Regions:
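Positively charged, solvent-exposed patches that mediate nucleic-acid binding
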Residues: 1-118
C-alpha cells in the first residue's frame, strides 16, 4: 500500500516527477479558470484515482503566499473531490490567486474544471 503523506493524500495521488509534469503540459488540454489554469491529460494507468500536481510561480508572491495557495488548493480538493480517475492534472495558480484567502474562493473554478473532466 502506498505510504501516506500529510493531509491524507497518498503519494500515488500526486505528480512527483518532472517527466509527469512535462507530459501533462505537452499532451494535455487547458482549462482556464479565473484564479487557476488546469492542464489535464488522460492517463488510464493511475489506478482508482487521478493524480495532481500544483504549480505556483514566483510572480504570484513570496514563499509564504505560494505555500498558502498550495495548501488551500490541496485542502479544497481533499474535501470536495479529488481528480477523477484516469486523469493527471496540474493546477497552475494565476496572479489573482494571491488575493484568495479561503479554500472556497477557488470553488467556482475548481468545480467547473472537475465537471469538465468527469
Amino acid at each position: 500500500m502506498p505510504r501516506r503523506t500529510s493531509f491524507g493524500i497518498l503519494k500515488a495521488m500526486r505528480l512527483r516527477q518532472r517527466v509527469d509534469y512535462v507530459a501533462v503540459q505537452s499532451d494535455g488540454m487547458k482549462l482556464h479558470g479565473r484564479h487557476v489554469l488546469a492542464l489535464a491529460r488522460r492517463h488510464p494507468g493511475t489506478g482508482p484515482h487521478g493524480r495532481l500536481g500544483l504549480t505556483v510561480t514566483k510572480k504570484v508572491g513570496n514563499a509564504v503566499v505560494r505555500n498558502r495557495i498550495k495548501r488551500l488548493l490541496r485542502e479544497w480538493l481533499r474535501l470536495h473531490g479529488w481528480v477523477p480517475a484516469g486523469w493527471d492534472m496540474v493546477l497552475v495558480a494565476k496572479d489573482s490567486a494571491a488575493r484568495q484567502l479561503h479554500p472556497d474562493d477557488f470553488a467556482p473554478d475548481l468545480l467547473r474544471i472537475l465537471r469538465q473532466l468527469s
